[in-house]
Swiss-Prot record:
Organism this protein belongs to: Prosthecochloris aestuarii (strain DSM 271 / SK 413)
UniProt record similarity statement: Belongs to the universal ribosomal protein uL3 family.
Protein name, per record: Large ribosomal subunit protein uL3
InterPro entries: Ribosomal_uL3 (IPR000597), Ribosomal_uL3_bac/org-type (IPR019927), Ribosomal_uL3_CS (IPR019926), Transl_B-barrel_sf (IPR009000)
Any Pfam family: Ribosomal_L3
GO molecular function list: rRNA binding; structural constituent of ribosome
Gene from which this protein is expressed: rplC
Keyword annotations of the record: Ribonucleoprotein, Ribosomal protein, RNA-binding, rRNA-binding
Lineage: Bacteria, Pseudomonadati, Chlorobiota, Chlorobiia, Chlorobiales
Presence of keyword Nuclease: no
Length: 209
């Protein structure tokens, strides 16, 4: 088992032994450092808190500066917790974590925040077909249609699919394959797409089933 934080660099393609183009996402998975070790005695559960990147102290709040100083590391851009059961190695406070714990062919789950699309209508947000394009229709082309009865039930049911803000959701994509590891640059090349925009941060965890 292994877990790490990474920064999404972008997408590319590689060619396999069958000369097929495979779309891949490149993730910069270091430098990561252990910013806190949580124990069952002190915190009620066991986990490692990882920090990624190096940030100017002036950009970090005073409480977080003290938090990083306790670990003896420079402030990072993002922190995330991973249960100790997700790590094969025993990590110490302030130690570094790299892509060496992964191997090519591993299946991983990747969690990130999807791209924000802003306020979107039902056709874009929920794939509605829209209204009729003929028979005198003038302004119902991308409208949602009826959202409830009149006297019965006299209300709109909870969960009705409507227009609203689209994207910017926490999403986990399961079962992606690591096709290449470049340890000298701490890069993971993962088959397929992962959530988020370029330069956003993602959590990568090996599959446990």
């Amino acid at each position: 088992m292994a877990a790490i934080l990474g920064k999404k660099i972008g997408m590319t393609r590689i060619y396999n032994e069958k000369r097929e183009a495979v779309p891949c996402t490149v993730i910069q998975a270091a430098p990561c450092f252990v910013s806190q070790v949580k124990t069952s005695d002190n915190d009620g559960y066991e986990a490692y808190q990882l920090s990624i990147g190096e940030r100017k102290e002036a950009k970090v709040s005073k409480p977080m500066r003290g938090h990083y100083a306790k670990a003896g590391i420079t402030p990072g851009y993002k922190i995330a917790e991973f249960g100790k059961d997700l790590m094969d190695a025993d990590l110490e406070l302030g130690s570094s974590v790299s892509v060496d714990m992964f191997k090519e062919g591993d299946k991983v789950d990747v969690r990130g925040v999807t791209k924000g699309k802003g306020f979107a209508g039902v056709v874009k947000r929920h794939n509605f077909a829209g209204g009729s394009r003929t028979h005198g229709q003038s302004d119902r082309l991308r409208a949602p249609g009826s959202v409830g009865g009149s006297s019965d039930p006299s209300r709109t049911f909870k969960g009705m699919r409507m227009a609203g803000r689209m994207g910017s959701k926490n999403v986990k994509v399961r079962g992606l394959q690591i096709v290449k590891i470049i340890p000298e640059s701490n890069l993971l090349v993962i088959k397929g797409s992962v959530p988020g925009v370029k330069n956003s941060y993602v959590e990568i965890v090996t599959r446990n089933k």
